[in-house]
Amino acid sequence: MKRILYLHAGAEMYGADKVLLELIKGLDSKEFEAHVILPNDGVLVEALRQVGAKVSVLDYPILRRKYFNPKGIADYIRSYNFYAKQIALYAREHSIDMVHNNTAAVLEGIYLKRKLKLPLIWHVHEIIVKPKAISDFINMLMGRYADKIVTVSPSGR
């Protein structure tokens, strides 16, 4: 059985949230075990549990505009380092086989790929154009670390 760890940017029930729910709902439970770590509690938590996912909530940082300044960058790096280690511990304890970043705003999968040598699937739901430096940085990270990149439309490519 393959254990997949999904990292997502929230726990609401909008587009990317619904895609994640449907994706996990469609997994063959004899072949795959879905683990999801979300940065906050919300309606998605129970919905995912209803379809058999093992869900944890851990307040890890999501790349947002509030981090796009010198103080924000320092805060993000500090928080990222702290929580990425906790997520890696979870991955080891649950014998995770693969990581699935379910948005461009979640970067913690990179840490798991580098430290635990796990394959990384990166699912892109958004088109980030501005600020261009951030767009270029995220695109570089995806190109460098993702084993596969999935987009929801040709526009995301």
Task: For every predicted segment, state its role.
Residues 98-116, 131, 139:
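An aromatic- and histidine-rich active-site surface loop
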